[in-house]
Amino acid sequence: MKIGIVGAMAQEVEILKNLMADRTETRVASAVIFEGKINGKDVALLQSGIGKVAAAIGTTALLQLAKPDCVINTGSAGGVAKGLKVGDIVISDETRYHDADVTAFGYEKGQLPANPAAFLSDKKLADLAQEIAEKQGQSVKRGLICSGDSFINSEDKITQIQADFPNVMGVEMEATAIAQVCYAFNVPFVVVRAISDGGDGKASMSFEEFLPLAAKQSSTLVLGMIDRL
């Protein structure tokens, strides 16, 4: 099995990249794909760049060139569900766009034509992620992750997203685009993100301060998954 891993930022993939043996590097547009072995397992690690388009370009290149059997999206997210704190893990059961709106033509909020309203994560991967997170002693929640091309940093924006998606756990900028590409290519995926901020007025300062912690937490979980896949 070859495991595909996607992170948007250098900080989000650095730990995993540095553990990779026999590493090769391929650049496609703004994306970088690192291939090699982590703990003896074949891994293709994508640093996609930030945002939905960058994530889609990179994930398409990853699936076409490296041909992984599954994809794990790692990195950070803003926590909007009650009780989430910095460093906690959110695992996707499903992902949706919070900034897509074709409701004028009868689609659900967040749904794009010719696509489902929600992209469902692979249950086996999500179950494995939850099991390992709990064994590692990490605080974990599982559910809906919403994506959009905005860094959410105000209570008003959170309130608006929660009005459309009451069950949303976390918000970020790539996961649903990654999920859409995996759906199109019929490749199982899961999103595993660590909370870096609360999506509120202090989010930008919190993100800068706690991104290293979030990257460490999510990478630790992904390493545990690699050992079991």
Swiss-Prot record:
EC number: 3.2.2.9
GTP-binding found in the keyword field: no
Entry annotation: catalytic residues: E12, D197
Residues noted as binding substrate in the record, renumbered to the chain: G78, I152, M173, E174
Presence of the UniProt keyword DNA repair in the record: no
InterPro entries recorded: MTA_SAH_Nsdase, Nucleoside_phosphorylase_d, Nucleoside_phosphorylase_sf
SUPFAM superfamilies, per the entry: Purine and uridine phosphorylases (SSF53167)
GO molecular function: adenosylhomocysteine nucleosidase activity; methylthioadenosine nucleosidase activity
Keywords carried by this UniProt record: Amino-acid biosynthesis, Hydrolase, Methionine biosynthesis
Biological processes per GO annotation: L-methionine salvage from methylthioadenosine; L-methionine salvage from S-adenosylmethionine; nucleoside catabolic process
UniProt record similarity statement: Belongs to the PNP/UDP phosphorylase family. MtnN subfamily.
NCBIfam families, per the entry: MTA_SAH-Nsdase, PRK05584.1
Protein's UniProt name: 5'-methylthioadenosine/S-adenosylhomocysteine nucleosidase
Species in which this protein is naturally found: Haemophilus influenzae (strain PittGG)
